[in-house]
Swiss-Prot record:
This protein's name: Succinyl-diaminopimelate desuccinylase
Gene coding for it: dapE
List of residues binding Zn(2+) 2: 94, 124, 337
One Gene Ontology biological process: L-arginine biosynthetic process
Matching NCBIfam families: dapE_proteo (TIGR01246), PRK13009.1 (NF009557)
UniProt keyword Lipid metabolism present: no
Lineage of source species: Bacteria, Pseudomonadati, Campylobacterota, Epsilonproteobacteria, Campylobacterales
CDD domains found in the cross-reference section: M20_DapE_proteobac
EC number, as in UniProt: 3.5.1.18
């Protein structure tokens, strides 16, 4: 059932933030669940919920939107192709396989509490009208889940090898070094910002702000762009700009990064802009959702998953901000956002079994 459902879901050309009708399709697939659509500026979110008993409130979450397919595919990106044990289509790994797995598990599994499915079509883009709107609604009606599994593709080499219990934060910034433009033949009459930053760049690029912790790697300043001048050989630039990103751990915050950079740049004429684009989060490894999902993964796959926080940001951070114990688990992520994206059919079936086992044994 889950594979056929996934194929139908992959047919929807749901390029972010357009769900292309996929959310209605999912809602109709689960007629026993109460459906609540939350829409703003043409962007849709869907909350499906069902009360089975007096037990705890468990949720699954995911996004149906995908990035544009781009060129160079060997098949039509929105016509799923089954070949050699894989399904090829845009969104097959990221993350319609995860959505299909928990939707089908919710349809078949028995539960003792309240089960919710929280879906958005605004994750791959800005996310302005996505998951946070759905969570704000649930908070207003006092119906936030206690636990949530976000079915992002998390596994690395082998299905079952990785559960994300957190994510690093993301800090973006820009440094502008001020100089005085002039003729290269008269360097004594110029203040070249390239010369100013050259001896300091090694203190910025790839600098570790901390030594990392149990679940987080060090917070490293990564320079992403350096530019200045007019692309000519006989004029020194009036300024030079450096853009950077820091994926920060629990040991470093935006103020730490700003203070460090200002100490390095002390004495120069410069401007610094910096902001926390997304917050880091970490769910306690002893949380019930972590322990139970680990048990289900090991039971179904025979693999003991590693708890980690690797990778970029995801919507799990929003759940954490609302006080929900959130973790992530899904298929292998070796083809996400790539041409000829594909997912293993075996992994899809196993993911469905993991989620079904988690639901039925969540007590």
């Amino acid at each position: 059932m889950v594979v056929s459902f996934l194929k139908e879901l992959l047919n929807f050309r749901s390029i972010t933030p357009d769900d292309a009708g996929s959310l209605e399709f999912i809602a109709k697939f689960l007629p026993d669940f109460e459906a609540k659509f939350i829409e703003k500026n043409g962007t849709k979110n869907l909350i499906l919920s069902k009360i089975y008993g007096d037990g705890e409130h468990l949720a699954f979450a995911g996004h149906v939107d995908v990035v544009p397919p781009g060129d160079g595919w060997d098949s039509e990106p929105f016509t799923p192709l089954e070949k050699d044990g894989y399904i090829y289509a845009r969104g097959s790994q990221d993350m319609k396989s995860g959505v299909a797995a928990f939707v089908c598990a919710a349809k078949e599994a028995k539960f003792e509490g309240k089960l919710s499915l929280i879906l958005t079509s605004d994750e791959e883009g800005d996310g302005t009208y996505g998951t946070p709107l759905a969570l704000e609604y649930l908070r207003e009606i006092r119906d936030l889940p206690k636990f949530c599994v976000v079915a992002e593709p998390t596994c690395d080499k082998k299905f079952g090898d990785s559960i994300k219990v957190g994510r690093r934060g993301s800090i973006n910034g820009k440094i502008v070094i001020k100089g005085v433009q002039g003729h290269v033949a008269y360097p004594e009459k110029c203040i070249n910002p390239v010369n100013l930053i050259a001896p300091l760049l090694s203190k910025i690029a790839d600098h570790d702000m901390d030594g990392g912790s149990e679940f987080f790697s060090p917070s490293k300043i990564v320079v992403t762009d350096i530019r200045g001048g007019m692309q000519v050989c006989n004029v020194t630039p009036s300024e030079l700009s450096i853009m950077f990103n820091v994926r920060n751990s629990n040991l470093t915050d935006v103020n730490d990064v700003e203070s460090y950079l200002r100490s390095v740049l002390d004495g120069l004429s410069y401007e610094l802009s910096i902001k926390q684009s997304s917050k880091r989060f970490l769910t306690n490894k002893d949380s019930k959702i972590v322990r139970n999902l680990m048990a289900s993964v090991t039971k179904i796959t025979g693999v003991t998953p590693l708890l980690n926080t690797k990778g970029g940001t995801s919507d799990a951070r929003h759940f954490a901000e609302f006080g929900v114990d959130a973790i992530e688990f899904g298929v292998i992520n070796d083809r996400i956002h790539a041409k000829n994206e594909r997912v293993s059919i075996s992994e899809v079936n196993k993911l469905y079994e993991v989620f079904k086992d988690l639901i039925e044994n969540f007590y």
